[in-house]
Curated annotation (Swiss-Prot):
Main localization of the protein described in the UniProt heading: membrane
Pfam families xref list: Zip
GO cellular component: plasma membrane
Binding-site positions, Fe(2+): 120, 123, 149, 152, 181
GO MF annotation terms: metal ion binding; zinc ion transmembrane transporter activity
Membrane-traversing stretches: 5-25, 32-52, 61-81, 109-129, 137-157, 171-191, 195-215, 236-256
Membrane topology note: Multi-pass membrane protein
Protein's recorded name: Zinc transporter ZupT
Job description of the protein: Mediates zinc uptake. May also transport other divalent cations.
NCBIfam families from the UniProt entry: PRK04201.1 (NF003243)
Catalytic activity: Zn(2+)(in) = Zn(2+)(out)
Keyword set, alphabetical order: Cell inner membrane, Cell membrane, Ion transport, Iron, Membrane, Metal-binding, Transmembrane, Transmembrane helix, Transport, Zinc, Zinc transport
Domain of life of the organism encoding this protein: Bacteria
Length: 257
């Protein structure tokens, strides 16, 4: 249980990398940000559809109705929360840095922070649950989550810093979203320790797979296209899928996971 918790902590802490980039003014190019988001989406799609969902369905005692039902619940649950939460895109905030409305920018950044925090909370649970069930998949999910946490931290810290002039305040607000992910992992660690039934774990994995697919197709890929409309995010997606698939083959070949 310790390694999955550490992976969750590291994935959430990646938000601070973006936060520091935001206050230091060394913003990565839009092309790099877009590619990293596509790369993260590719990792999540491959792991969710080729590993997590099949593993959940293959669990002894798991019925297809329950497995696919939990997958659909994960999909619909994500879309439902996404529609209910205050929603602003990171690149919108980065563009607003040029406008002389610091108070408005700060309010928007805070709303985004709250939305991202609620959005990151189940990601922390997903990372922990996946790593607890299968460590090699946990590494992949943690990497994908960390990659897309970096532009999130950058998106919040940059505008807050521009509005307040305080690096500490900017890092604080950006860090909240990362802490929400860590909190999700810690709660999963505390609660799921007594709920280690294979069926329960498989059902949660199926739901997590649905969440990851929805996150990839509804958020990461469109966001990558918006950030860098001149380049196709599919390259990042395909690269993420290829590298993750190759790494899983290597890990399975040498007997890890």
């Amino acid at each position: 249980m310790l390694v999955p918790l550490i992976l969750t902590l590291l994935a959430g802490a990646a938000t601070f990398i973006g936060a520091f980039l935001g206050v230091l003014g060394q913003k990565p190019s839009n092309r790099v940000l877009a590619f990293s988001l596509g790369f993260a989406a590719g990792i999540m799609l491959l792991i969710s559809l080729m590993e997590m969902l099949p593993a959940a369905l293959d669990t002894e005692g798991m019925s297809p109705v329950l497995g696919y039902g939990m997958f659909i619940i994960g999909l619909l649950g994500y879309f439902g929360l996404d529609r209910l939460l205050p929603h602003a895109h990171p690149q919108d905030l980065m563009q607003k840095r040029q406008q002389p409305l610091p108070g408005s920018i700060k309010r928007t950044a805070i709303l985004l922070t709250l939305g991202i925090s609620l959005h990151n909370f189940p990601e922390g649970i997903a990372t922990f649950v996946t790593a607890s069930s299968n460590l090699e998949l946990g590494f992949g999910i943690a990497l994908a989550v960390a990659l897309h946490n970096i532009p999130e931290g950058l998106a919040v810290a940059g505008p807050v810093y521009a509005a307040t002039g305080s690096k500490r305040t900017a890092i604080f607000w950006a860090g909240i979203s990362g802490m929400a992910e860590i909190l999700g992992g810690v709660l999963a660690w505390l609660i799921l320790g007594s709920l280690v039934s294979p069926i329960v774990m498989a059902a949660i994995m199926a739901a997590v797979a649905g969440i990851m697919v929805a996150l990839s197709v509804d958020e990461l890929m469109p966001l990558a296209k918006e950030i860098d409309p001149n380049n196709n995010p599919s390259y990042g997606v395909l690269c993420g899928m290829s590298i993750m698939g190759l790494s899983l083959v290597i890990l399975q070949t040498i007997g890890i996971g």
